[in-house]
Amino acid sequence: AKGVARIAQALGMKVHAYDPFVIDQQSNSSDVTFHDTIESLFSSCSHISVHCAMTSETKGMVNSGLVRRMPDISPNGVQCGRHIVNCSRGGIVNEDDMLELLESGFLTSLGIDVFENEPYANPKLSAHRSVSSTPHIGAATIEAQERIGEEIVSIVSSFFN
């Protein structure tokens, strides 16, 4: 999530976040607006990128009720639509709700690289013209594989020391 925030800031975006597990959120970063509730976050943002673990609390968390809170105008008044990206875990975003919101035109776009039932994606959702999907290959970059290798070396080294 921090990497996405850095890229968003480099592109001139104002970054907002919600994390129920971080107690003193305001002290973590002066460049990020933290929200006390997920409802507040969705009510403030036209672009949402989901980065969380799958738990009983997060299953189906991003649903029609939350997305319908999203504005379609940026803070500086530009009509930009509503956009969601999910690269965390399948099942956190309610796929049926997203398809309904896309078909109605309420949701402008959905970027998704994880599906509730993998490896078989929801065919109607993945075929929608406003959906950009990949087959869960987000970690298949050279940089990601290098970081994984470095982490493995660190863990093995710590074990033997």
Describe the role of every protein-language-model region.
Residues 68, 72-161:
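Rossmann-like dinucleotide-binding domain for NAD(H)/NADP(H)
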Residues 1-72:
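Rossmann-like dinucleotide/phosphate-binding beta-alpha-beta segment
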